[in-house]
Structures are given as C-alpha cells and as structure tokens.
Amino acid sequence: MPTINQLITNGRKGIIKKTKSPALKNCPQRRGVCTRVYTVTPRKPNSALRKVARVRLTSGYEISSYIPGEGHNLQEHSLVLIRGGRIRDLPGVRYHIIRGTLDTAGVDGRKQGRSKYGAKKAKVAKTASAK
C-alpha cells in the first residue's frame, strides 16, 4: 500500500494492454503480398508439415502466416488477406490467411465449415420424383 506522498510523486501506473497481433494495427484484416511459401514442422508432441507463407503487409510489417485447409494455390507475389489468430504448435506464426479472397482459392470438396475455407456450396442434382 503506497503512502500519500508516494502517490503524489509517482501516481498510479495504468495497465498497458499488449496486442496479440501488432501487424494488423487495430484493423480486422490486412492485405499483403507473399514473399515466400514454405512448410514448417510443428513443436514437440506433434508431427506434420504445416504450410506457411511469409507476407509483406500494407502496414509495412513482414509476418509469417498460416495457410489453412488441404491444398493451396499460393506462390510468390500472390495477393492475400490476413486475419489474426495464432497456430499453437508453430512458434512465431500469429496470423491466418483468409481462403477464397484475392488470389487465394477456396478449399475444393469442402462440405462442412465451408465459410472458414472459402468453399462454395456443392450443387445438388434435382430428382424427377420431387413433385
């Protein structure tokens, strides 16, 4: 507990909020250009080849971002849209690429959770017995 004199000289320090996605600069999404597309192995109990892209954003930052879903069409100089959201088993990857926007294609053959992967609804063949 501080004394009155300590409060007069120093005052109370406010709590500083630290953002988890500084490259977005308080925007919901940011546009960027892929500078490198590669795979990374995850941290200890997991084993895989996670697809990652190095992206130069319009905010000036260069970040690593995860490419969700099975298969992708990204390469160097592709335009992508970035959202926040880290990948727990990839150190330093704090952003996701949004599928189905700009140069990023949606995931083919996706039936559930389509909105998260930019997949269109599959066409259903109409039968003649439906009267």
From Swiss-Prot:
Cross-referenced InterPro entries: NA-bd_OB-fold, Ribosomal_uS12, Ribosomal_uS12_bac
Residues in coiled coil: none
Location of the region described as Disordered in the Swiss-Prot/TrEMBL record: 106-131
Record-linked SUPFAM superfamilies: Nucleic acid-binding proteins
Modified residues (3-methylthioaspartic acid): 89
Cellular component GO terms held in the UniProt record: small ribosomal subunit
Keywords: Methylation, Ribonucleoprotein, Ribosomal protein, RNA-binding, rRNA-binding, tRNA-binding
Compositional bias segments (type: Basic residues): 112-124
GO biological process: translation
Gene3D superfamilies found in the cross-reference section: Nucleic acid-binding proteins
A GO molecular function held by the record: rRNA binding
Function: With S4 and S5 plays an important role in translational accuracy. Interacts with and stabilizes bases of the 16S rRNA that are involved in tRNA selection in the A site and with the mRNA backbone. Located at the interface of the 30S and 50S subunits, it traverses the body of the 30S subunit contacting proteins on the other side and probably holding the rRNA structure together. The combined cluster of proteins S8, S12 and S17 appears to hold together the shoulder and platform of the 30S subunit.
Record's subunit section: Part of the 30S ribosomal subunit. Contacts proteins S8 and S17. May interact with IF1 in the 30S initiation complex.
NCBIfam families: rpsL_bact
Similarity field: Belongs to the universal ribosomal protein uS12 family.
Protein name (database record): Small ribosomal subunit protein uS12
